[in-house]
Design a protein with these regions (language model features):
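Alpha-helical membrane-anchoring segments
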Residues: 1-305
Length: 305
């Protein structure tokens, strides 16, 4: 059938260990987001209710006008729920709960005049992870359901880039590339490094054309061999590193969602910690590479008084 190659691509099986690692990372970030990146959402309810202009989904769904009590309940239940979900327990129940509450958290955050576009990939990941089923860290067994969850997250990440370029052309045309967008950003929130870069003639204009080019070409990451794909994803991360270093914009939720491209199953901090704390690593010197073959590693006799 004509749709089979697309279906196979969308549901390409991945190790369950990768899903477990991605799930833990995403839910831990949600908890960190509440207390580090978006604690200001709780102050939104201090303004008059008529300033609340919900986004389209907030208008279509029967979502109430936020109150201090409502936002407080969302904060604490979401914080506890995300930490529990990070353990991998009850992936569907906790996963859907975290998605629903974080979705409402974002509706409240973005319904007072400013809408960030760096959270699209994270929201898609939160919506997809409950469908991935159970997964344990280090499990090499492959899962198509988990592959689907990662793939749709990857698509959302790339759409963030491509649609950003589309928006630039839609509202600014080529004037976006030839204007003073980066210069204005540096004036508003630039670092010392940005001030040095801004002194190079025409460099900011070249950078603006480069940003447009990489955003428009970002979908090509899906047709590259795995080695080159990882290299391109590394370039994406380096771009955001430069962005943080020059105009202090982090895109942290987007960076977390972009780990869906990475072989996260290779990172197993819990297993590493267990190995370091195991008796073999703490006291079995006979297995240590620095122990010579003729070393006497037996216990020393007690001194006689």
């Amino acid at each position: 059938m004509a749709g089979q190659p697309v279906t196979r691509w969308l549901t390409e099986a991945v190790p369950r260990g990768r899903i477990a690692a991605f799930r833990t990372l995403v839910y831990l970030f949600v908890a960190a987001d509440l207390v580090v990146f978006t604690p200001w959402v709780r102050t939104r309810v201090d303004v008059p209710g008529d300033l609340y202009q919900p986004l389209l989904l907030g208008r279509l769904l029967p979502l109430p006008t936020p109150t201090p009590a409502l936002v407080g309940v969302i904060f604490w239940v979401l914080l506890v729920g995300s930490l529990l979900a990070a353990t991998g327990r009850a992936p569907r129940l906790l996963g859907w709960t975290v998605f629903a509450l974080y979705f409402e958290w974002m509706i409240v955050a973005m319904s007072y005049g400013k809408v960030d576009h760096d959270r699209f990939g994270l929201l898609v990941a939160l919506a997809a992870l409950p469908t991935a089923g159970r997964a344990r860290h280090g499990d090499p067994t492959r899962t198509q359901a988990g592959g689907w969850a990662l793939r749709v997250t990857q698509i959302a990440v790339i759409c963030t880039y491509f649609l950003a370029a589309w928006a630039k052309f839609r509202f600014g045309g080529l004037d976006w590339a030839t204007g003073s967008v980066l210069a204005r950003a540096i004036i508003r929130r630039g670092t010392d490094l940005a001030d040095l870069i801004a002194q190079v003639p025409h460099l900011l204009i070249v950078a603006q054309f480069g940003i447009l080019a990489f955003e428009l070409l970002s979908p090509l990451v899906f047709v590259l061999p795995e080695r080159w794909r990882l290299a391109v994803v590394g370039f994406f991360y380096s771009f955001h590193l430069v962005t943080i270093a020059t105009i202090t914009i982090s895109f942290a939720p987007h960076l977390v969602a972009m780990t869906s491209f990475l072989p996260l199953e290779r990172v197993r901090p819990v297993s590493l910690l267990r190995r370091r704390r195991s008796p073999a690593s703490l006291g079995q010197l006979g297995d240590h590479p620095l122990a010579a073959a003729d070393d006497d590693l037996s216990a020393a006799p007690l001194a006689q008084s």
